[in-house]
Amino acid sequence: GHELQKLEKYIVGSKNKYDALLVKSYDNVWGHDIKLHAQNYNYENHLYSFYKANCDLNINTAVSNGKYEDYKIVYMPAYNIVTDAEKEKIKEYVKNGGTLVLTFRSGTRDEYNRVRPMALPGVFKEIAGIEAVEFDAPRKPVKIYGEVSGSAEIWCDIIKPDTAKTICTYGSEYYKGESAVTVNEYGKGRVYYVGCDLDNDAMKELVRIISKSANVETVDTPNGVEVVKRDDCTIILNHNENEVDTKIKGVSLFDGLEFNGVLDGYGVQFLEGSI
């Protein structure tokens, strides 16, 4: 009770600080359910891979279809059904300095789920600065090399960059050496195009690169340790039953003393300000 009284002014009325937005569209949920195109493809799992990578790096990530301009990074995995109004809204977000992350299976259908007669990635082709000339659903893992190394197992867009820069290339199959992940400067912002699924470690490293480019801070912690940033404080939670050295330092709001980074099993710590 006494601890809660000390924290009251930091908690009551405060809000989580979200740097990233993961856009989930139910139109696209239903659209992908109708047309899988690849046996192991699952739209929800595709979204989760981006969410998990952000969580692993302790980036507060909202999940909605909200105001893009409120976030430094907007992730739109497999955003295939797009209205003309959405297209313009997304374009303006990037022009004004936002960082947009697109993936394979994006931009090719209108609000009625009708295919647009356009080269891939459809309405996003200009801002992504690429053309996906072909795609493959590989029968075995395909290696990925470049700024991020890993593998793809479900989907591979074969990308021809126009104004975009290649970040990763494929290391096997008939498209060996072709672009797998790109980034394009557009207006004051940038657009990442992820042409394939990625294993967990590779996805985490890609999200780290994207976050750094957008001036979003990442925090590495041991497994089971969560960091939540609010307006005037940072909350650290140990979801493990054992004591953990989080390596995080700061002034504790419980007693005003320097926190040494060690949390008891299932322990929690409130630190002053944002770490």
Specify the residue positions occupied by each region the protein language model found:
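Carbohydrate-binding surfaces of carbohydrate-active enzymes
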Residues: 1-275
